[in-house]
């Protein structure tokens, strides 16, 4: 029933298996790839384009379902919705890797779906999916020039060792995360983030990855041979004569238009010329009988015009060594930089390079603002967000605003990779950071303008980044064996060239790299020269940025939120929260701050100003602090009793001011001096296992300073000892007769027992006229553990 084809090999320490003929047999090509414990079903379906087009309508979708890791989706519907950012990014990786290998002029619809069936959270799914897409194309019959394989490369800096398809845990210690795709002869696509690695280290990673792809390329070739399926015949429509006809009539006009360095004017001139060419060529090639059939269709004319323009610009650059805007090959456009351009934002920068402009804005938030990512590798929280927006007006188009597309997600992720390494550790800067790049003008390299603008905006905000980051986009014009590398490419140079090579980094090294090809790959030699030329351009841009701001501001702006983190004993968390959240609510209501308590005892305090942060911090520290003898605290009288007053202090702790410690002179009734809810300053003069002894008379109630600056060295006693303050001995004594308790108390007083040394009292000036804490001058007995404690 099944015509099963199976091939396998060992690659990167794991088994790689290709299978077809059993699943999804209605597709033009379907391959199940299992690499380690990760399985992907890749399918290819091709058909005629629904409408005449002059481009390849290729659609690539990577789909990751929760069942692949044995999970049920969250939410009400319990079903996957729109593609996640990770699915979108992997789809782009596959698309960018295979698109250059379709033959020129092939405009049939091609749909590739890579469905993640099983995931071991170890083997990179993007590697498995690209292998599956290539193998499915190989047996689909769709014209496809060669095999392309992807590899994920890591780098252990301490060991100078490259890693192939390492697990997520292994990549934690890696200084590099690079995904590369290549065919037998060249590299097609690179996407990476790094921790300030040198050009030679990055080049070594690319070379290492490309070499390791060869084994799998050979396996796919053997797999295709065993299937016996060959690509169906494709003969592109010959439009050579049409290209020559356009060139003979319009070369001068287009040369003049492309010489205009003002993009807006250049675009308008080119649009008029294109409309004229289309009109003239349709009229010229219309059949004599007057029907609408032409020897060449409008799509043929558009394709021929694109081919003509591409050849015109490329030949001008190569023959005259002059670019569209007159710059040298390594020239950088004029740069203008402004920071702090928006008054009420937490940080902002306007970065303009030629006709490309990015307005980048930062916002600071609390850990509650972190992005919760529901990923197959496990839920995680992101405290750094970077969003890239590309509105239609940036290129002079009239169109409705839409949700971020694949391109915007991809460009934002590249800038995120470029910036992430230089951000401070969360323990040093606990804010959630959001950076938004609004592209207000675009003429090439808007993602790298975002990188520069983000670095400037972060420094303007006061985020202590390790170093400024700049980015540059490189281009390539390749004719035969001759090639020219262009620095800081324009949009037209990107469109008509062969490569878009983006490099971002600090003065010390590369933090992100992305390479896309429009031809079937480039050699390691071209990549090396591109990296070195990009370094010169990056340094030039960093110099321009340093003229405006060299390092982060010392502090965040006044209108930015304040966050402070403190650590408390985990056992004290319940005290801070309080019964039913009473304490934490009181803190938030009184201070206006927001307080977050982590399980490890980290307390995050968020407020709009420093005063509120300090107020909340002091309230929390009062709750978790322990009273110390000799320390003065603010307290509130909560109860008046015959023998003294009970005071609440340190966030709810209770202490007793004996009547003898209220004033230096004799008082008949406590209520004649203080009342409930009175605010008092008290000195801790004794600590028991359960009780705290307080004094008012020894503290200046105005200044809060101990009288005469004296600190009392009072002995901390055990609550069960005979001379312990408010000690009743055993539990049985507590429940004895009142007569017995009073007798016991008088016995202690007559024996001179005290909760502190009498010698200490004498030494501290209490020997003459000053009475001990147990003194009975007011005729009151010292209570033995009151029941309401």
UniProtKB/Swiss-Prot annotation:
This is Polyribonucleotide nucleotidyltransferase. It comes from the Bacteria. Belongs to the polyribonucleotide nucleotidyltransferase family. Its EC number is 2.7.7.8. It comes from Ehrlichia ruminantium (strain Welgevonden). It is found in: Cytoplasm. Residues 630-697 form the S1 motif domain. It is an enzyme of class 2 (transferase). Residues 737-749 have a biased composition (Basic residues). Keywords: Cytoplasm, Magnesium, Metal-binding, Nucleotidyltransferase, RNA-binding, Transferase. The gene is pnp. Gene3D superfamilies: GHMP Kinase, N-terminal domain, K Homology domain, type 1, Nucleic acid-binding proteins. It catalyses: RNA(n+1) + phosphate = RNA(n) + a ribonucleoside 5'-diphosphate.
